[in-house]
């Protein structure tokens, strides 16, 4: 559960930095405090945010290449930043299985966007996964001749880095709560029920 929370917080952070023009470091601190996540989840969120920011050129290049019918700047904010988080995981985190990164992104798309976004995210990430598997010589159902990924997956996590501030961003002095993504009441109720069903009685996550 801590990694799901970390991904949610990373999404919220990139969303606030993107829409609210907030410094990534400030947005991350605010999101972590706002959602009261565990230290493990906060650490994972920090890795995702810093990695996505540091490798944004490569990540966005892959999004533009794979989403040929979309202008990246006009893509829905949730979709764009979900893809940034997931593609960072897929390209730069060898310790995270490709399917795990994809499935988590799909679930977050369902929570914070809709089924259409989930299908869109699945299509983009599925294509990238096929390319990465082909580059490693793994079996895939994709046809031969698929274009190679812009950057092959590395074998070690990306080095830690300080989030790169947006030169055009206006530093916030108070929490900008209007830029936080809100899940729908239906999704919130569904997720709450699912968590209650999957959480063993008397067991709390450390």
Swiss-Prot record:
Pfam family, one: NusB
Entry's Gene Ontology molecular function annotations: RNA binding
Family assignment from sequence similarity: Belongs to the NusB family.
A single cellular component GO annotation: cytosol
Disordered as annotated region, ranges: 135-206
Keyword list, A-Z: RNA-binding, Transcription, Transcription antitermination, Transcription regulation
InterPro entries with a match to the protein in the record: NusB-like_sf (IPR035926), NusB_fam (IPR011605), NusB_RsmB_TIM44 (IPR006027)
GO biological process: DNA-templated transcription termination; transcription antitermination
Protein name, per record: Transcription antitermination protein NusB
Function summary: Involved in transcription antitermination. Required for transcription of ribosomal RNA (rRNA) genes. Binds specifically to the boxA antiterminator sequence of the ribosomal RNA (rrn) operons.
Low complexity bias spans: 169-180
């Amino acid at each position: 559960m801590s990694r799901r929370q970390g991904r949610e917080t990373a999404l919220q952070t990139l969303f606030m930095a993107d829409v609210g023009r907030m410094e990534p470091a400030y947005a991350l601190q605010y999101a972590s405090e706002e959602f009261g996540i565990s230290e493990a989840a906060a650490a994972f969120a920090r890795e995702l945010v810093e990695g996505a920011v540091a490798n944004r050129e490569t990540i966005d290049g892959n999004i533009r290449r794979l989403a040929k019918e979309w202008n990246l700047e006009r893509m829905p904010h949730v979709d764009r930043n979900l893809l940034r988080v997931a593609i960072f995981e897929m390209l730069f985190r060898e310790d995270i299985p490709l399917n795990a990164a994809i499935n988590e992104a799909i679930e977050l798309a369902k929570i914070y966007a809709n089924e259409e976004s989930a299908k869109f995210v699945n299509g983009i990430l599925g294509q990238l996964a096929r390319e990465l598997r082909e580059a490693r010589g793994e079996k895939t159902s994709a046809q031969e001749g698929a274009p190679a990924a812009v950057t092959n997956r590395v074998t070690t996590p990306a080095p830690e880095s300080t989030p790169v501030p947006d030169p055009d961003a206006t530093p916030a002095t108070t929490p900008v709560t209007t830029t936080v993504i809100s899940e729908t009441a239906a999704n919130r109720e569904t997720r709450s029920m699912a968590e209650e069903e999957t959480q063993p009685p008397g067991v709390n996550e450390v």
